[in-house]
């Protein structure tokens, strides 16, 4: 999961019932607090296959479908086939893959995958997921890929694609492999198959005085040795049905990855395959042990990056040439504990271009520890941390994605979760704290793509025999090393419901922008217990705008047209931003209750309209269409979107429009790249 060394509410009820095995499983609480140990260790060391969205009269929307769904890297941003800037937002699906109960897959079957995807789209408006895969299950015997496992994975990915979600698969590992751990161990891992561990001849796993599971990364000699052997491509002697073979362990992994990717490419239709964004080769890479004279930076340069180049070549051979590799640096490169941070961030990789994406995780190790940060997160808490992610992506000339972030939802630091997660989403949206966003919006920066850890519909209902021990059946929370981070669970009737404030998770965000985003901020008014968290207040110098927003939720987007597409700018509308009451104030006009989108050919009948999200029956999006005559390259556009907590008059909307126009004109936004 995420920075494994340290880490790790409801919108309207989903009407979808999620069919799941074991609905009567007990909700045991189990042991908690497996997160502080990692800190100690560090210090010690448009939709594809689903039916297209339709206009009011029933005709398909012209800009949806494969062209909208297909995503590529374009400089420091993702773009779709229309040339619109794309933001990917969603969840990891899911930590269930790290368990054995569903055979190394996120779901018991495709039906559960469909129900989970529908709930994710309905309850959060997410448009992308990181889909976890297991090397151990893909290659249970050396050189023999389990096509049945890959078929089941393909079926589950298909269900997600058909719900309008984009997918990037991830061969996941934590602590290298569960097969390193004996049946009575306090800890477990996931990743490599049994044969690779048995052939390695590793010492009996022991973390010594470890308090929590993350310490195994730097203190468990078995984990360190196995990880080191993977990166050095140690040749293992393994027994097979055809006799004894010599198997370089990294080569075996690359062979399996290539066959997995080829399997997916061959069994997904072309339209569905368009929804596959790329591939994440290896979760949270770390050397295990550095060679003599080696450090974190030289390890990235001489070991990790050549691995990515080898994986990139396998992607090309498997039919993934046009999809980027999601390259993650040394997992400790952006630790927010100074004594734990290691130099890295692919500093010596040069410009990556469209063949790669800068892929990183971020967790507040200080907050998770319960020792290094007292109190709650505050406005702007992580803008510097995620600003560093933006800076590295710009230096690498590639898009960035934060493919894991989050905070525990139970345990002695869980009271921090509402503020920590709000501050993380804030920093994904903008470089600026709310206190300075209105006065310095030109410094806001690009909106980051991200996937929260995690989305597991079986949360609290597992039945996992830890390390194969039938006397240690785990049911509570994530059923994995005492973690509890799933944003979703099933209620007593089997419906998927959010475990965190829906105002936090169901967010306004720019899914597709016809041009380049210059500034974005969303005030979600999420709650910390009974306290409303308001970090971005409209300034007193804009009284009409402040009055229009009131105490409701609102977001502001400023973008610069590049004159290259007539496809509309698209923002997800959270629950409560209903078509009948949401208010939009923009240079394109003002409206309360945007009408359904209709068009004459490719010309929108209304510059401000709404429509269903592709692949859904209740999630909606706002569509902003600038008339061609007023949308030349370099034209600045803006839109304030409020949730309709009050019904503003046309006069108030017009006054707010004048204030916003003056604010944009005086903010110093560039009109050219």
Language-model regions, residue ranges each:
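Secretory targeting and sorting signals
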Residues: 1-55
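Signal peptide processing junction and immediate N-terminal pro/mature segment
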Residues: 49-55, 257, 326, 449, ...
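Low-complexity, acidic Ser/Thr/Pro-rich repeat tracts that form intrinsically disordered stalk/linker regions
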Residues: 53-59, 673
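Extracellular glycoside hydrolase catalytic/binding regions
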Residues: 69, 240-446
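Extracytoplasmic/secreted cell-surface and envelope-processing proteins
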Residues: 138-142, 176-179, 335-336, 368, ...
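Solvent-exposed beta-strand/loop surfaces of large extracellular or lumenal domains
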Residues: 586-617
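Active-site mouth of glycoside hydrolases
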Residues: 64-79, 85-88, 92-334
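Aromatic-rich peripheral "rim/lid" segments of glycoside hydrolase catalytic domains that contact
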Residues: 346-353, 359, 412-585, 614-672
């Amino acid at each position: 999961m995420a920075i494994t060394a340290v880490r790790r509410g409801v919108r309207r009820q989903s009407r979808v019932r999620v069919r799941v095995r074991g609905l009567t499983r007990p909700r045991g609480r189990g042991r908690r607090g497996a997160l502080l140990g990692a800190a100690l260790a560090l210090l010690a060391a448009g939709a594809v296959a689903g039916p297209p969205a339709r206009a009011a009269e029933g005709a398909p929307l012209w800009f949806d479908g494969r062209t909208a769904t297909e995503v590529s890297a374009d400089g420091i941003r993702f773009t779709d086939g229309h040339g619109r800037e794309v933001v990917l937002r969603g969840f990891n699906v899911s930590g269930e893959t790290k368990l054995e109960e569903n055979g190394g897959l996120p779901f018991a079957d495709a039906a559960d995958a469909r129900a989970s995807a529908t709930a994710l789209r309905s309850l959060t408006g997410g448009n992308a997921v990181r889909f976890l895969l297991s090397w151990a299950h893909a290659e249970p015997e050396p050189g023999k890929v389990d096509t049945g496992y890959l078929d089941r994975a393909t079926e589950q990915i298909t269900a997600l694609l058909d719900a309008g979600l984009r997918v990037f698969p991830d061969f996941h590992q934590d602590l290298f492999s569960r097969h390193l751990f004996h049946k009575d161990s306090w800890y477990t891992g996931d990743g490599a198959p049994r044969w690779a561990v048995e052939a390695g001849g590793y010492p009996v796993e022991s973390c010594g005085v470890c308090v929590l599971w993350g310490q195994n990364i730097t203190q468990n000699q078995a984990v360190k040795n196995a990880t080191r052997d993977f990166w050095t491509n140690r040749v293992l002697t393994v027994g097979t049905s055809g006799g004894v073979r010599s198997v370089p362990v990294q080569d075996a992994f690359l062979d399996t990855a290539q066959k997995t990717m080829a399997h997916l490419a061959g069994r997904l239709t072309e339209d569905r395959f368009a929804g596959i964004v790329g591939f994440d080769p290896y979760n949270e890479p770390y050397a295990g042990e550095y060679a003599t004279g080696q450090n974190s930076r030289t390890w990235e340069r001489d070991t990790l990056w050549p691995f990515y180049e080898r994986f990139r070549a396998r992607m090309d051979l498997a039919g993934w040439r046009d999809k980027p590799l999601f390259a993650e640096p040394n997992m400790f490169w952006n630790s927010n504990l100074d004594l734990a941070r290691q130099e890295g961030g692919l500093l010596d990789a040069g410009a990556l271009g469209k063949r790669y994406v800068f892929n990183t995780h971020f967790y507040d190790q200080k907050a998770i520890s319960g020792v290094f940060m007292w109190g709650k997160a505050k406005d702007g808490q992580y803008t510097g941390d995620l600003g560093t992610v933006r800076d590295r992506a710009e230096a690498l000339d590639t898009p960035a994605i934060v493919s894991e972030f989050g905070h525990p939802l139970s345990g002695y630091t869980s009271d921090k979760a509402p503020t920590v997660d709000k501050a993380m989403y804030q920093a994904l949206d903008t470089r600026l704290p709310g206190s300075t966003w209105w006065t310095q919006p030109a410094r806001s920066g690009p909106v980051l793509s991200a996937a929260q850890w995690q989305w597991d519909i079986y949360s609290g209902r597992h039945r996992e025999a830890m390390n194969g021990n039938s006397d240690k059946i785990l049911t509570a929370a994530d059923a994995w090393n005492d973690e509890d981070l799933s944003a979703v669970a099933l209620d007593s009737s089997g419906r998927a419901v959010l475990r965190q404030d829906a105002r936090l998770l169901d967010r306004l965000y720019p899914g597709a922008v016809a041009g380049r985003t210059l500034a974005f901020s969303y005030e979600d008014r999420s709650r910390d217990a009974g306290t409303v968290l308001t970090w971005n207040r409209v300034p007193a110098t804009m009284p009409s705008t402040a009055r229009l927003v009131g105490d409701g939720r609102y977001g502001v987007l400023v973008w610069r047209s590049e004159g290259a597409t007539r496809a509309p700018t698209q923002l997800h509308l959270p629950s409560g931003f209903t078509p009948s009451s949401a208010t939009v104030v923009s240079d394109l006009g003002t409206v309360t209750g945007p009408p359904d989108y209709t068009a004459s050919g490719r010309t929108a009948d209304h510059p401000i309209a709404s429509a269903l999200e592709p692949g859904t029956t209740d999630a909606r999006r706002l569509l902003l269409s600038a008339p061609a005559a007023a949308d030349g390259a370099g034209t600045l556009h803006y839109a304030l979107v409020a949730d309709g907590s009050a019904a503003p008059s046309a006069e108030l909307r017009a006054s707010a429009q004048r204030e916003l126009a003056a604010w944009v004109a005086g903010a110093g936004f560039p009109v050219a790249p």
